[in-house]
Amino acid sequence: MSPARSSRVGVDIGGTFTDLVWVDDTTGAVKVGKFLTTPKDPSQAVEQGVVTLLSDAGGSAAEVRSIIHGTTLATNALIERKGARTGLLTTAGFRDAVEIGHEGRYDMYDIFIDSPAPLVPRHLRLEVTERMAADGRVLTPLDEASARAAIGTLREAGAEAIAICLLHAYRNPVHERALEKLCAELAPGVPVSTSSEVVPEIREYERTSTTCANVYVMPLMSRYLDDLERKLHELGIPGNFYIMLSSGGVATPATAKRVPIRLVESGPAAGALAAARMARELGEPKLLSFDMGGTTAKACVIDKGEPLLAREFEVARADRFKKGSGLPIRVPCIEMIEIGAGGGSLARVDRMGLLKVGPESAGADPGPACYALGGQVPTVTDADLVLGYLDPGFFLGGRMRLDVEAARRAVEEKVARPMGLTTTEAAWGIHRVVNENMAAAARVHGIERGKDLRAYPLFAFGGAGPVHAWQVGRILKVPRVLVPFGAGAMSAYGLLAAPLAFDFVRTATQRLDAADWAQINGLFGEMEKEGRAVLRRAGVEAAVITIRRTAEMRYTGQGHEVEVEVPAGTLSAASLGPITANFETAYRALYSRTPMGVPIEALNFRVVVSGPVPEISVSGPKGDAPGPRVSLAPKSTRQAYFPEARGYVDTPVYDRYGLQPGHSFPGPAIIEERESTTVAGPGARVRIDDRLTLIMEPGEAAR
């Protein structure tokens, strides 16, 4: 083995499985691994997976030059309310702003509407005497006595973390910084987050909610990242350790510990990146990314080879399909919709006698009934096993055997008998309900973005995604379904395709026809300098750093903005024309027309500073499988249920590793690989393209 050999590892921790991908940078060889997540200590599964993967690949820890990690740990802590006991220091009179929220209701006609409770209870939200004007002028100096008293009260109340969010601190952070110093003096060792660092932009409610969420998960994420870094060091891995951000870039652990709120949805973001890379490689201008794992399902629209981006999202929605029903998090993110629908989603019969699936999940412990680890409640995986879609002896490539009788017993006792159905009917009901739930979520996502999903091929991945993709695609009426090679660990591939990157934002309201170009240039210069410093500390050479500028703009009097590109270089009055044209083009794409004679104003200015995009292909042969067979003959047949066939039928089972470009066959068919299984229903036409992508297209009978 050459001493110059180097490799990279991508690690994606999900609620049920932890996926790893190892890539040899010298030969391009790839190894994929899937391991049960260890909920009590997620780093255990990472450690086990890295050791096993390196052993299988014949590699060594000393060769690993980088590990890129995505996790849903911060997301789960927010949803399950398992973060730190958090206190809030805010401007006098604004103690309840984080609970009042917006005047708008996400459901106008529901008088019993539920809104998510703030992360900080009222008795831990304390006021300090100070006031800043909207332009950054100090109206009332910070009263140190009131500040000391408030910090002391939080200490006595057992606060484990403190959020500081003062009115208009995005324009002048001097009071927040003074409070931060007082916290270090009076509450040493207690983590502190200031809004001027976490989200230095206008909008009080979103800024406060985000700052509270950041410090709420900070102790948990710091402990986790410290522990994982230590374990990787003990394994002898000398390379860099990076964390995926929700925006699709990666950052160092030091940055991630300071702003852990940017890790929320980092795992799903990696899957969207992989789908975007695949769209470019396949020449598909549009894709609907569909990632179904063990706990959740995610849908993301890919346009022109890029995922849609948003500057805000919600967590812990009271109503999963309604905007405004969750906690607002104001950080850059890849825009997607996520619901509790995965292989481990629990099926039950409610008090009305209706079948419900999810959002609760069996996770990895105890897992579905068929895992034989103590689970008694039927899950989607149990239903898929009963229907014949999964091979009990080939789950995870044969490393884990599934108990068919346990699955059948759970479905029969918990669903079939209460509903007066046969076991098969109950299993199909579970399968169909979860498909309808996921399709409905994807449809909502498309409608919110003004997209007609009938024009978007479905790109399916995740451990459970290919099992359900054909039926979900039929519900959505997509033109075709694409399943990549190595679909079960595609999010881990996406981690290896992410550049080092970070976003910066500043608020400064400017009417374009009377803009202070010197101030705007100063803001961009300040953010670009800060961004270059962050990337240089992470080891990125100055010559390969790229910078993207944008501004959030609107017509005067409007309440929300449209983000548009801003040219590089020094801006002046001559820049007004190109910037205005960019805004009008973007506005017209969203609203079909532009108002005449209304001045345009910019509210927020943003900079994204990025390193080079790593080279990796997410399609084509992976070097992680037995040599391809020439024959297209199925490796076996088994009984699988399809309602179109009115029952169980002998269904050919193909070895995914034996399929070659140009192969095609009709459905029904089952295609197996180690980390996932693809199910093609009756009427499907399956073919393999030159990158080994499995493509399912409906015949007329299947439309």
Locate each region found by the language model.
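N-terminal glycine/serine-rich phosphate-binding loop of ATP-dependent small-molecule kinases
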Residues: M1-G87, A133, T140-A163, E176-K181, ...
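Short beta-strand-loop/turn "lid" adjacent to the catalytic site in phosphate-handling enzymes
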Residues: T18, K31-K34, A61-G101, A163-E176, ...
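C-terminal, non-catalytic interaction/recognition modules in large multi-subunit enzymes and RNPs
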Residues: P3-R5, I13, A145-A149, T153, ...
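Conserved short loop/turn motifs at secondary-structure junctions
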Residues: R65-S66, A163-N172, N214-V217, A427-R432, ...
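Glycine-rich beta-strand-to-loop/alpha-helix junction loops that act as flexible
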Residues: T71, L166-L167, S195-E197, S246-S247, ...
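Conserved phosphate-binding/catalytic loops in two-lobed NTP-binding clefts
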Residues: L186-T210, K477-Y493
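Conserved phosphate-binding loops in N-terminal lobes of ATP-dependent enzymes
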Residues: G10-I13, F17-V21, A29-A45, G49-V51, ...
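Glycine-rich phosphate-binding loop of actin/hexokinase-like ATP-binding domains
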Residues: L20, D25, V30-K40, G87-G93, ...
